[in-house]
Amino acid sequence: MWMKIQRVKTVIYSVSLLVAASSLMPIANAAEKLQITLRVGAYFRAGHVPDGMVLAQGWVTYHGSHSGFRVWSDEQKAGNTPTVLLLSGQQDPRHHIQVRLEGEGWQPDTVNGRGAILRTAADNASFSVVVDGNQEVPADTWTLDFKACALAQEDT
């Protein structure tokens, strides 16, 4: 059983000098509510982008009883790996950037086939959204749209 689902959505931009929306977006802040925060990283240029380049850093917080967290996106998966996404440009849907969700202890969610799971009773967990593979990225705008939930104790 999944509980306390929240969603965070932000936009990354690529222009000649890729402008990334540097924002901190808390979704909720009450003690028993799930919080998901996504902060987009520094500016980068359209063109060659190296594998592993961090595009955004995310945090999930839940102070209630739980056994872990799940973070996922409804964006198109790239291949068979649940943590890899293929984002389409907003200005031109033929423009793509392939990204992956990663972080210490996070594992691909092979049961649901989307996103990643972290088994932990800790109140906080962090994750990163990084470029998946060396790519030539055109100037465009992409949306990062992630959802998160805390896993109920019986989900372990």
Where are these regions (language model features)?
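C-terminal segment of classical bacterial N-terminal signal peptides
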Residues: 19-27
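A generic short-segment signal for beta-strand/edge and adjacent turn/coil regions
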Residues: 26-29, 37-41, 68, 95-100, ...
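Generic hydrophobic alpha-helical membrane-segment signal
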Residues: 14, 116-118, 128-129
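Bacterial N-terminal signal peptides that target proteins for export
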Residues: 2-15
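N-terminal small/polar-rich segments of proteins
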Residues: 28-91, 124-137, 141-143, 147-156
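Mid-chain, structured segments of secreted extracytoplasmic proteins
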Residues: 74-120
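A conserved short alpha-helix in the GNAT/GCN5 acetyltransferase fold that borders
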Residues: 16, 20, 147
